[in-house]
Amino acid sequence: LDAGREILFISNADNLGATVDPVILNYMDEFNIPFLMEMTAKTPADVKGGTLYQQDGKLKLLEIARVPDDKVDEFCDQKKFKVFNTNNIWINLVALKDRLSQGPLELTVLVNRKNVGETPAVQLETAIGSALECFEGAVGLTVSRDRFLPVKKTDDLLLLRSNLFTLNKGQLKMSPQKKHLPKIELGEFLQNIENFQNSLPIIPDLINLEELKIDGEVRFEGTASLKGKVHLNGLKKPLILPSGAVITDESLQG
């Protein structure tokens, strides 16, 4: 605030689609919105993502960790909950300062049970998105899928490096030829970034791909085009694909 900045934009570090959008910034300023959460349409890969609901005139965030076991299927129903939280958050710092003068934000604590190696563990975390409950006039804004492009595995990296995306003024844009991204499942060998780089020196054409599963050591020697549903298996013996290969609805083994 002392530097004259009144709007803060926060996003997950792995979300390559999260850029400062001047249109959203102007919307925040013009309508004096204190807190804004970007939402986007669910796909089968996002059914567990947190969603918004309204109670007593206030927007609230519901994360799957707070959903009873017998209601999880309902929570994951794309027809009932059509959008989910991208964790792209915009906050008006003047409104935040005013709110903090009234006391600390009461953020929802999530309990996640997981294993660290073979040791059961309980991870406690607070969801920044739950802060929207603390602001009168908070907004959930549905945005295009281009603003939610997380890279957590090489599966995601393959998609973003392919011809499914172009870079326009610092923003990744999905090809207009695709409505949904293909399903990618790369095995343990290709989860290693060095193996990934060596095995895919040139990313194949994925425009007409629906599903890709790669097991074991598979290497592309040059350009290639993958179409439909493709399964490449190099578990028993490395599978080497020559430059110019076109693979359509096939299952190949090394």
What label would you give each PLM region?
Residues 21, 26-254:
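Left-handed beta-helix
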Residues 16-18:
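A short, conserved beta-strand element in the Rossmann-like catalytic core
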Residues 1-5:
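Active-site nucleotide-sugar/metal-binding loop of Leloir-type enzymes
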Residues 6-13:
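Short beta-strand-to-loop acidic/aromatic patch adjacent to the donor-nucleotide binding site
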